[in-house]
Amino acid sequence: MAGFGAMEKFLVEYKSAVEKKLAEYKCNTNTAIELKLVRFPEDLENDIRTFFPEYTHQLFGDDETAFGYKGLKILLYYIAGSLSTMFRVEYASKVDENFDCVEADDVEGKIRQIIPPGFCTNTNDFLSLLEKEADFKPFGTLLHTYSVPSPTGGENFTFQIYKADMTCRGFREYHERLQTFLMWFIETASFIDVDDERWHYFLVFEKYNKDGATLFATVGYMTVYNYYVYPDKTRPRVSQMLILTPFQGQGHGAQLLETVHRYYIASSSVLDITAEDPSKSYVKLRDFVLVKLCQDLPCFSRERLLQGFNEDMAIQAQQKFKINKQHARRVYEILRLLVTDMSDAEQCRSYRLDIKRRLISPYKKKQTDLAKMRKCLRPEELTNQMNQIEISVQHEQLEEQFQELVEDYRRVIERLAQE
């Protein structure tokens, strides 16, 4: 019996030691993957140029780890404009194949699932491609040029936005490289069917000089799908939008979204512009752009705003800027906050009630549904449903929603003031 206890203790300790040993070979793929946009040869050794994914779960599972390596580095370096790629896997040590019957993850195979063939694996080949980068030019039609002040007070940076499609020579291959970034920065990203001609592509590039030549660097892009609306209209829907990490916080998202809106505004066949499953950050960006577009419309004058939302606002927003009624309502709420003195009790109360009347609509629908349920539910089922829409809880949720909205709206107003 004592011998059995000693054996059991040994097995527990052995298992613990093995697990500890195996844990040393687990790497966080969010930090193991190193991304870089290269303009100059010295960028290869410059850690400041390195940035990292926000998500890796689509390739490496929910725990976002790779097993079997110590000191794992997955290098994905892109030439800044053409996005010609160098892919290499480096590590200090790899788990022995005979070590407790475990195998290292096929890291290279996982990355190959999303990057197109034709990439480099060594620095010399990559630098040879970099020497030819002056030949790269943006795809498609130039829509907009704008500048961003230099943080050091030097010459402004110049950026351009283009609209492209798959008929542009070389664009299909370029897009295959560009879309790989989606997997690292959009949580639910997926690749689109590029053979569907209803996709539109909008690209942002930085225009810069290098050794007397004009070059272009990829900044970000947006894909838009054109849905048919009976009988003769289309509804462009923003599907994917990404500004690459080194360029974030510089206003490129707003420039891109406004340019896309202005592109579709010119088309009489477009009904309105929407977005597919928009993130909170996208909604905030859209709020800013739409308010900026609408703020000078007569229907959004101070006098009209204080009278409440009306059909004319929805009509004008749709006709002038292809904005649907729901988004026009948000524009109204932001602009009304702008002209409301929230320190004035009466103005504040009026604004609060106006917003809450909209927010309460889903709760009223639940009340209507409950009235119908009374006719067919058993008492215990009815009690359960009533508990879900308790009045006091409704008021708390409404107030919380209201405060969150006002906070978001104030940020939009602050950004408008900086324009």
UniProtKB/Swiss-Prot annotation:
- Binding positions (acetyl-CoA): 241-243, 248-254
Where along the sequence do coiled-coil regions lie? none
Q: Which residues carry this modification: N6-acetyllysine?
A: 9, 15
Q: What would you give as a GO molecular function for this chain, any one?
A: histone binding
Which GO terms are recorded in the biological process aspect for this UniProt protein?
A: nucleosome assembly; response to nutrient; subtelomeric heterochromatin formation
Please name the top-level EC class of this enzyme: transferase
Write down which residues bear the modification named Phosphoserine. 190, 343
Instruction: List the residues marked with site Interaction with histone H4 N-terminus.
Output: 199
- Any one cellular component term from GO for this entry? chromosome, telomeric region
Q: Main subcellular localization, coarse class?
A: nucleus
- What's its job? Histone acetyltransferase that plays a role in different biological processes including cell cycle progression, glucose metabolism, histone production or DNA damage repair. Coordinates histone production and acetylation via H4 promoter binding. Acetylates histone H4 at 'Lys-5' (H4K5ac) and 'Lys-12' (H4K12ac) and, to a lesser extent, histone H2A at 'Lys-5' (H2AK5ac). Drives H4 production by chromatin binding to support chromatin replication and acetylation. Since transcription of H4 genes is tightly coupled to S-phase, plays an important role in S-phase entry and progression.
Maturation and modification: Phosphorylated by AMPK at Ser-190; phosphorylation increases HAT1 activity.
Q: Which domain of life is it from?
A: Eukaryota
Q: What is this protein called?
A: Histone acetyltransferase type B catalytic subunit
Known partners and oligomeric status? Catalytic subunit of the type B histone acetyltransferase (HAT) complex, composed of RBBP7 and HAT1. Interacts with histones H4 and H2A. The interaction is dependent of the ability of RBBP7 to bind to the N-terminus of histones. Component of the histone H3.1 and H3.3 complexes.
Q: Tell me the segments the record calls region Interaction with histone H4 N-terminus.
A: 62-64, 225-227
The EC number on file is 2.3.1.48
Q: Would I find Nucleus among this entry's keywords? A: yes
Q: What is the lineage of its organism?
A: Eukaryota, Metazoa, Chordata, Craniata, Vertebrata
- What is stated as this protein's family in its record? Belongs to the HAT1 family.
What InterPro entries does the annotation carry? Acyl_CoA_acyltransferase, HAT1_C, Hat1_N, Hat1_N_sf, Hist_AcTrfase_B-typ_cat-su, Hist_AcTrfase_HAT1_C
User: Positions modified as N-acetylalanine?
Assistant: 2
Query: Does the record carry Nucleotide-binding as a key word?
Result: no
Catalyzed reactions: L-lysyl-[protein] + acetyl-CoA = N(6)-acetyl-L-lysyl-[protein] + CoA + H(+)
Question: What keyword terms does UniProt attach to this protein?
Answer: Acetylation, Acyltransferase, Mitochondrion, Nucleus, Phosphoprotein, Transferase
Active site, per annotation: 276 (proton donor/acceptor)
